[in-house]
């Protein structure tokens, strides 16, 4: 009997063409290939297959893939070559990339530009699926519900996962919807950390921090435009949120400082692991354990609202199942912001029209649109934050942690021009005033060893590298004498403990140990500050500022928490603190209904 490993090796050889005399036939799809090895049953099992019979989340299909090919751990490469089977996205569905009946798509290339060496890359492209028309949505709204739950959560990023887990633990039946082929949302790309005050980590390091200081820093960063009541909850419950995640197995043991904070309060995994993927991996696993896995490929398209303005459920569009109605006693909107919706960005913030975005492709404003259609009120909806350090010419966010750990920011001549740890809006404004509207982050071997994400940027070919400052300046097109003086002055400021030039409050590392590195950056859309207006209990407000019964919201889809400008580390805290609150209050409301 052939073992699974042997069968996987054989199929791998077939896919490479080694056993069939060359490349796959032109236009052949993955499904065509598998049909020669057992027909539809080789992927779908023995049941009759129709488009509607394939589960939208495709979990069974992916289990079948692993039966033959093994798990990601079995097939990923261990060398330095970029391997999509070993990425920050985690162990996502095989079908996220390997579409069976059309040309495969490397989802990494939503952000990157890796060469596509996937099997069947010359298969016909899939026909884009048309958006459901109004008549079809209306028909689904009037149809009998396919399912009913106490709570439906829309969006499986950090806010959505936290809401779903909290609601389930409160005793509610829960459905977690995710429109993409894998979960994580914008949270998957979070690279800085989680701001929290009063944690055991701060106490162990002797960091003197207070709730009042956290609130003041956040209000100052937001230029006083924040909803103070929401900020106070964020600060007061931030430490409990860290403990909540740690109880699921998360590591947030390292504490650093982000821009706009007076002390170290940004918690992240030890060893420089990126915080977003780490938290999402933790939440995915916990949701599975708690019985609320994300239903993937399932887009919420319309909230169901009765004549009393009470939310009663949602219309869902499944990849395979089409439109259907789900009844719910409460709905939590956790669908993220609109940073990838160019039309919405141009409408709400015309000056940002055409600007690149660091956001996940899922950040298209679905939650804002559905809330508006349902009669919800918005707050600060036209406020958008540009992150100062997006990789120039890319969509890759260069984490604030790089500056926090010690990188120096210079312009194209090699001169410093700003306090690297100022707030994001001020840093972005300063960069846009420089020649070429771009800048460079410069650092040395010590920072390269300390901040793990920097090695990821190197892996992607984003870094300039040299054994001398002069060589680095030449590689980056700077004036060697200017850069040499800039770093000499900076190291002297660090040695005496005061930045005479720009007042940088924290200078953890010198830039003195070869090799030296630089990465080119420019501002890009990073966070939509405004959104759905909510109460302190995460209830969505209508246009008369009254809570809409049965509708809750958390995360970037909401407004009010961050004001005009968000501090680095506050978004992750926001998703955890208010995701939990939304789930708990939605469950409480739902369980009180008849």
Write out the residue ranges for each language-model feature.
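Beta1/beta-strand and adjacent pyrophosphate-binding region of the FAD-binding site
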Residues: 143-159, 175
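Conserved N-terminal/central alpha/beta ligand/cofactor-binding core
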Residues: 140, 173, 179-293, 297-302, ...
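Glycine-rich loop(s) and the adjacent beta-strand/alpha-helix scaffold that form part
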Residues: 321-322, 326-390, 578-581
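Internal hydrophobic alpha-helix adjacent to the cofactor/substrate pocket in enzyme cavities
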Residues: 370-377, 484, 575-594
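Short sequence/structural segments immediately N-terminal
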Residues: 22-139, 148
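A glycine-rich dinucleotide-binding beta-alpha-beta segment and adjacent secondary-structure elements
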Residues: 302, 482-565
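Conserved beta-strand-loop-beta-strand element in the redox core of flavoprotein oxidoreductases
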Residues: 304-325, 331
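An anion/pyrophosphate-binding glycine-rich loop and adjacent beta-alpha core
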Residues: 368-370, 374-482
């Amino acid at each position: 009997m052939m073992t699974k490993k042997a069968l996987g090796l054989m199929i791998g050889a077939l896919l490479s063409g080694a056993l069939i005399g060359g490349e796959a036939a032109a236009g052949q799809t993955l499904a065509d290939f598998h049909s020669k090895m057992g027909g539809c049953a080789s992927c779908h099992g023995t049941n009759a297959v129709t488009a509607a019979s394939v589960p939208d989340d495709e979990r069974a299909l992916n289990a079948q893939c692993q039966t033959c090919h093994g798990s990601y751990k079995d097939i990923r490469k261990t060398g330095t070559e970029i391997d999509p089977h070993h990425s920050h996205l985690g162990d996502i569905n095989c079908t996220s990339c390997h579409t069976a009946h059309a040309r495969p798509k490397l989802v990494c290339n939503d952000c990157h530009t890796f060469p596509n060496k996937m099997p069947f890359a010359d298969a016909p492209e899939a026909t884009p699926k048309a958006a459901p028309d109004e008549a079809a949505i209306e028909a689904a709204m009037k149809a009998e519900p396919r399912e009913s739950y106490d709570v439906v959560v829309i969006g499986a990023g950090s806010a959505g996962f936290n809401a779903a887990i909290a609601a389930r633990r409160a005793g509610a039946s829960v459905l977690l919807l995710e429109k993409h082929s894998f979960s994580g949302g914008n949270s998957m790309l979070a690279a800085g950390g989680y701001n929290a005050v009063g944690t055991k980590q701060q106490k162990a390091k002797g960091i003197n921090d207070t709730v009042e200081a956290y609130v003041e820093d956040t209000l100052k960063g937001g230029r006083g435009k924040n909803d103070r009541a929401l900020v106070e909850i964020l600060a007061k419950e931030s430490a409990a949120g860290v403990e909540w995640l740690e109880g699921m197995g998360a590591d947030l043991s390292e504490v650093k400082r982000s821009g706009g904070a007076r002390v170290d309060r940004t918690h992240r995994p030890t060893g420089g692991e990126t915080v977003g993927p780490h938290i999402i991996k933790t939440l995915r696993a916990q949701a599975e354990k708690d019985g609320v896995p994300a239903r993937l490929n399932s887009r919420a398209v319309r909230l169901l609202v009765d004549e009393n303005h009470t939310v009663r459920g949602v219309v869902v569009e499944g990849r395979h199942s089409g439109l259907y109605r789900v009844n719910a006693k409460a709905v939590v909107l956790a669908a993220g912001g609109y940073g990838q919706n160019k039309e919405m960005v141009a409408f709400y913030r015309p000056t940002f029209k055409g600007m690149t975005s660091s956001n996940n492709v899922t950040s298209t404003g679905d939650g804002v649109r559905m809330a508006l259609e349902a009669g919800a009120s918005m707050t600060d909806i036209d406020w958008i934050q540009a992150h100062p350090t997006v990789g120039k010419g890319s969509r890759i966010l260069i984490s604030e942690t790089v500056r926090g750990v010690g990188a120096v920011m210079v312009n194209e001549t090699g001169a410093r021009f700003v306090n690297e740890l100022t707030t994001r809006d001020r840093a972005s404004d300063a960069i846009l005033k420089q020649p070429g509207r771009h800048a460079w982050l410069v650092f040395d071997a010590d920072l390269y060893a300390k901040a793990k994400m920097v090695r990821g940027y190197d892996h992607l070919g984003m870094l300039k590298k040299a054994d001398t400052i002069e060589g680095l300046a030449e590689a980056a097109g700077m004036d060697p004498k200017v850069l040499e003086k800039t770093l000499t002055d900076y190291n002297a400021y660090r040695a005496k403990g005061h930045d005479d030039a720009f007042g940088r409050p924290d200078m953890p590392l010198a830039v003195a140990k070869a090799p030296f590195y630089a990465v080119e950056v420019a501002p890009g859309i990073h966070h939509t500050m405004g959104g759905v207006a909510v109460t302190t209990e995460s209830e969505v407000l209508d246009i008369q500022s009254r809570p809409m019964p049965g509708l809750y919201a958390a995360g970037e889809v909401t407004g009010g928490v961050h004001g005009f400008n968000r501090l680095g580390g506050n978004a992750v805290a926001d998703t955890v603190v208010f995701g939990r609150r939304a789930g708990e209050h939605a469950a409480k409301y739902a369980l009180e209904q008849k």
